[in-house]
Amino acid sequence: MIDGAGKSTLLNLIMDKLTPCRGSVSRHGNLRLGYFTQHSADTFDLRLSATENMLAKFPNADDQEMRSFLGKFQIQGQDSVKPMMMLSGGQKSRVAFAALAYQKPHVIVFDEPSNHLDMESIDALVGAVKDYRGGIVVVSHDEHFMSNTCSELWVVGDGKVSRFRGGFNEYKKDTLEKTRKRIEQSVKLLSNINK
């Protein structure tokens, strides 16, 4: 993924935060979208427990229902009732993902979800995403996260979004080969200039 290629613009169009300059964006009127970023866990009051935070977001739920729901995301027992400041980064991310999943979105858009997370936290998030039964759209530079959560690869660049036929390893090989060819062309141009 190349910075400045238009990934954020694409996500903002998907999330209806931007209007396209030309063309259109169509979505079903009942489509529920969720949005998960590297900062999603920062929205909680860390003095409160995961259960208390969830109940604050969803006041129509009861304590037992929320604890049971959090358990589906491996936030169980004491972890669900102790202050969130005592949870690991991965646990906080799982609580954030649980809060998002509780809203039952059809599709969750992930914007660099693993930035600033350690491997244990990334693996915890990967596990939660694998258990999710809706659609996902991921924008990430994290090969490990993408390889373990995505079944299709779409490339953003040159003002287009196109499906890449193959997995992440094939994409890397293809990108390296294109880069190698560009470097060879540049070297030839420079050598011709220096003659």
Model feature map: region roles:
Residues M1-K195:
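ABC ATP-binding cassette signature C-motif
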